[in-house]
Amino acid sequence: MKEKLTNNTFQVNEKGYYGKFGGAFIPEILHENINRLQKAYKSIIESQEFIEQYYKLLHDYAGRPSPLYFAKRLSDKHKCRIYIKREDLNHTGSHKINNTLGQILLSRKMGKTRIIAETGAGQHGVASATVCALMDMKCVVYMGKTDINRQNLNVRKMEMLGATVIPVTSGNMTLKDATNEAIRDWCSNPDDTHYIIGSTVGPHPYPDMVARFQSIISKEIKSQLPEKENRNYPDYLIACIGGGSNAAGTIYEYLYDNRVKIILAEAAGQGIHSGHSAATIHLGKIGIIHGSKTLIMQTSDGQIEEPYSISAGLDYPGIGPMHAHIAKQGRSEILAIDDNEALSAAMELTRLEGIIPALESAHALGIFQKKQFKTNDVIVVCLSGRGDKDMETYYK
């Protein structure tokens, strides 16, 4: 049920909350690290020196700006004007490098020498290992064994880049479990280590920090659209949502623009009520996961349910607190896309436009099977990553 819109703010407050979601619920051993990060991150990332270094890396190393591509054949089929924000063309093949460049640059300025990361689909792990190689920092990546088996190409990339990939065999052996192990590592190594969370989840300031680094996506959309549509806003923004980083980046600059409707696609897996899904916003109840108060898939007695999605990057049982807040406020519409709908949408884009999307991004494209748009609607879809890593799944 949507809550009445009583407060026109979608940004984090000084205590790390988006409405009633967020905060920092952490072990005592991490208090000093988190407090130091909370105090330092804004002053560092808002400094002119940091901004210049960060944007130079985005341009020269990551290859930004990423193109805003008019998908004519896809538009003709669905009878609207569809633009694709090509995050798949960034260095490392996804939006993840926007965040890893920012966080690793930040961690160096804070005197850290070792980076740990969690990864599901492997894209955040590859992006972390890539930037660590660039900046000569040690890198350890935690990855569930289930995800290692289905994303082996990315594992090889991480190892080639010099990272140590540690298989996680607890729980469902996916993203949630990898995150648990990364947090344990950080508790054991608080002095020299920075934990680089890949999504808008975790304790404050991570959700805000990751959203800020990913906001380059919507900044570019705003500057690119006028050349194509003679206005700087679309009618709709569409993105997939697991933890919420690419979605946060896609909508960040438009949150207060009521001309722009926001539609986010979460993973329905084998069906919302099948017991095998990751549709957290549809099914979740308020709880605490990985240091944040948010919506979580839970059993009746409060145990976290194991999520499922064909996409390794979307099977997370929680959601970023910003997204929990804007969904409950009615600012975003959430649609659940199942495995088959995502696979069908991936094939459609591939055959019509010659672009093979990541399975995560395919969920966003699946919205066109669920919803009809008007002929003159301008729609921007964030293609968060490329599909190389998912070829074995597509072939099945």
From Swiss-Prot:
<keyword id="KW-0057">Aromatic amino acid biosynthesis</keyword>
<dbReference type="InterPro" id="IPR036052">
    <property type="entry name" value="TrpB-like_PALP_sf"/>
</dbReference>
<comment type="function">
    <text>The beta subunit is responsible for the synthesis of L-tryptophan from indole and L-serine.</text>
</comment>
<keyword id="KW-0028">Amino-acid biosynthesis</keyword>
<dbReference type="InterPro" id="IPR023026">
    <property type="entry name" value="Trp_synth_beta/beta-like"/>
</dbReference>
<comment type="subunit">
    <text>Tetramer of two alpha and two beta chains.</text>
</comment>
<dbReference type="InterPro" id="IPR006653">
    <property type="entry name" value="Trp_synth_b_CS"/>
</dbReference>
<feature type="modified residue" description="N6-(pyridoxal phosphate)lysine">
    <location>
        <position position="96"/>
    </location>
</feature>
<keyword id="KW-0822">Tryptophan biosynthesis</keyword>
<dbReference type="InterPro" id="IPR006654">
    <property type="entry name" value="Trp_synth_beta"/>
</dbReference>
<comment type="similarity">
    <text>Belongs to the TrpB family.</text>
</comment>
<keyword id="KW-0456">Lyase</keyword>
<comment type="pathway">
    <text>Amino-acid biosynthesis; L-tryptophan biosynthesis; L-tryptophan from chorismate: step 5/5.</text>
</comment>
<keyword id="KW-0663">Pyridoxal phosphate</keyword>
<dbReference type="GO" id="GO:0005737">
    <property type="term" value="C:cytoplasm"/>
</dbReference>
<protein>
    <recommendedName>
        <fullName>Tryptophan synthase beta chain</fullName>
        <ecNumber>4.2.1.20</ecNumber>
    </recommendedName>
</protein>
<dbReference type="Pfam" id="PF00291">
    <property type="entry name" value="PALP"/>
</dbReference>
<dbReference type="InterPro" id="IPR001926">
    <property type="entry name" value="TrpB-like_PALP"/>
</dbReference>
<dbReference type="GO" id="GO:0004834">
    <property type="term" value="F:tryptophan synthase activity"/>
</dbReference>
